[in-house]
């Protein structure tokens, strides 16, 4: 068995590359099944967010290159381009990486809690696809436990910040009085929910939530006294919007340069602040060329995020130690599991030999042999049979000069100095 964690993230790839390697929710089940089928992977899961796309795989023999080729072909990328941004972690390092990701230690915003929920969703989808078995399943459970301990035992989650928080913080820097501003939020997922909460707490004058389905938009809008509209209503809402923050799972841009130009004319070129958190992008990059638009992507939030990192650096060290302990403990338990099948087979063999000797003993008793003779024969027969295979193998190893194996056998059978004198 061997674990592999492979992917790209906000530190290794630009938003342009990340959006081309992203998986939509609709793609995941089919992609997972194809991944296992074409790369000889026994178990697999895919984590795809705005900041990372990662594959977690269990194989008999690690083949990162085969997986990279599959990922490049699936997304119609050149292998060289993908290799330039990709990272690969194997076995212990893969386990540690997964735990760091789930704990928020590898996030754009250190310690952000949303990633754990996204990791749990990745696990649920892989189970639905039938690509998670006992080994990867155990790794996910250990990962969730480690992340929970980090959240509970350290201050990594205090004064919570996120990409959503960073976007709102940037808006505060641009608009001195948010209570006079109107905001248009595109999408109705977890990130937009956080944005809505932050804006509501800051007393933004009016919030509008635009979504593909009005029902989903209404559910979110009701929580914060906002208004719900459809995506088709965005052009009209743009005219009144000072702040636009977008985060959907759309594969195509939702907001184009033409629509924004029209809105700016009706606004008499009053500036609009925009943050596109989505990957792939919701807002056409050309929108940023307009004079009265301030367009930011997730990659532009780094400076805002950097300010929030300072308060979490101390907690991060303690969190890293907990992750290291969790990863080491998991690998120890996993290696112990490797012995289970051997022990089971050895026990079954021993029980078969015992039953054979027991049947001989019962026949001897039935034929009138004395109990002491039968017990002695039973003990000798069982001892000889149990020692036969090990004796043959030890002689063979000795003839081959395998002193290391002989030393291991001495340890295995507890034959250290003076062991024969000890009472069991």
UniProtKB/Swiss-Prot annotation:
Reaction catalysed by this enzyme: (S)-4-amino-5-oxopentanoate + tRNA(Glu) + NADP(+) = L-glutamyl-tRNA(Glu) + NADPH + H(+)
Annotated site, Important for activity, chain positions: 97
Keywords: NADP, Oxidoreductase, Porphyrin biosynthesis
Residues annotated as the enzyme's active site: 50 (nucleophile)
Binding site for substrate: 49-52, 107, 112-114, 118
Residue sites binding NADP(+) per the record: 187-192
InterPro entries in the record: 4pyrrol_synth_GluRdtase, 4pyrrol_synth_GluRdtase_dimer, 4pyrrol_synth_GluRdtase_N, GluRdtase_CS, GluRdtase_dimer_dom_sf, GluRdtase_N_sf, NAD(P)-bd_dom_sf, Shikm_DH/Glu-tRNA_Rdtase
Disulfide pattern: none
GO MF entry, a single one: NADP binding
Enzyme class at the top of the EC tree: oxidoreductase
Superkingdom of origin: Bacteria
EC id: 1.2.1.70
This protein's pathway: Porphyrin-containing compound metabolism; protoporphyrin-IX biosynthesis; 5-aminolevulinate from L-glutamyl-tRNA(Glu): step 1/2
Signal peptide stretch: none
A single GO BP: protoporphyrinogen IX biosynthetic process from glutamate
UniProt xrefs under NCBIfam families: hemA (TIGR01035)
Quaternary structure and interacting proteins, as annotated: Homodimer.
Primary role: Catalyzes the NADPH-dependent reduction of glutamyl-tRNA(Glu) to glutamate 1-semialdehyde (GSA).
Domain comment quoted from the record: Possesses an unusual extended V-shaped dimeric structure with each monomer consisting of three distinct domains arranged along a curved 'spinal' alpha-helix. The N-terminal catalytic domain specifically recognizes the glutamate moiety of the substrate. The second domain is the NADPH-binding domain, and the third C-terminal domain is responsible for dimerization.
Annotated family: Belongs to the glutamyl-tRNA reductase family.
PANTHER family: GLUTAMYL-TRNA REDUCTASE (PTHR43013:SF1)
Additional comment: During catalysis, the active site Cys acts as a nucleophile attacking the alpha-carbonyl group of tRNA-bound glutamate with the formation of a thioester intermediate between enzyme and glutamate, and the concomitant release of tRNA(Glu). The thioester intermediate is finally reduced by direct hydride transfer from NADPH, to form the product GSA.
Protein name from the UniProt record: Glutamyl-tRNA reductase
Organism: Pseudomonas fluorescens (strain ATCC BAA-477 / NRRL B-23932 / Pf-5)
This protein's encoding gene: hemA
């Amino acid at each position: 068995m061997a674990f592999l964690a492979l992917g790209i993230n906000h530190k290794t790839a630009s938003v342009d590359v990340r959006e081309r390697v992203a998986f939509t929710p609709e793609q995941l089940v089919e992609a997972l099944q194809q991944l296992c089928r074409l790369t000889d992977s026994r178990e697999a899961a895919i984590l795809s967010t705005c900041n990372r796309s990662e594959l977690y795989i269990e194989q008999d023999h690690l083949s990162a290159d085969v997986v990279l080729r599959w990922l490049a072909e699936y997304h119609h990328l050149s292998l060289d381009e993908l290799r330039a941004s990709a990272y690969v972690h194997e076995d212990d390092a893969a386990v540690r990486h997964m735990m760091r990701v789930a704990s928020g230690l590898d996030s754009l915003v250190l310690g952000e809690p949303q990633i754990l929920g996204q990791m749990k969703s990745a696990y649920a989808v892989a189970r639905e696809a039938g690509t998670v078995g006992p080994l990867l399943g155990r790794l996910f459970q250990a990962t969730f436990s480690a992340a929970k301990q980090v959240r509970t035992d350290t201050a990594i989650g205090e004064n919570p910040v996120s990409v959503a928080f960073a976007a709102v913080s940037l808006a505060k820097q641009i608009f001195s009085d948010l209570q006079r501003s109107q905001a248009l939020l595109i999408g109705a997922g977890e990130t937009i929910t956080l944005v809505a909460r932050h804006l509501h707490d800051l007393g933004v004058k009016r919030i509008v939530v635009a979504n593909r389905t009005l029902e989903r938009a209404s559910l979110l809008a009701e929580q914060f006294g906002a208004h719900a509209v459809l995506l088709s209503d965005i052009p009209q809402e743009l005219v009144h919007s000072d702040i636009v923050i977008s985060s959907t799972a759309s594969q195509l841009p939702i907001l184009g340069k033409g629509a924004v130009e029209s809105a700016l004319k009706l606004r008499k070129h009053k500036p609009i602040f925009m943050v596109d958190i989505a990957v792939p992008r919701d807002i056409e990059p050309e929108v940023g060329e307009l004079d009265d638009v301030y367009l930011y992507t997730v990659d532009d939030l780094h400076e805002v995020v950097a300010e929030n990192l300072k308060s979490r650096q101390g907690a991060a060290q303690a969190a890293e130690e907990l992750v290291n302990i969790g990863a080491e403990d998991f690998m120890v338990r996993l290696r112990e599991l490797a012995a289970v099948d051997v022990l089971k087979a050895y026990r079954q063999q021993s029980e078969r030999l015992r039953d054979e000797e027991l049947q001989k003993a019962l026949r001897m008793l039935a034929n009138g042999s004395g109990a002491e003779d039968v017990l002695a024969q039973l003990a000798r027969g069982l001892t000889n049979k149990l020692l036969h295979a090990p004796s043959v193998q030890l002689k063979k190893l000795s003839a081959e000069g395998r002193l290391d194996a002989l030393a291991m056998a001495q340890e295995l059978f507890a034959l250290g100095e003076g062991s024969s004198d000890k009472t069991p």
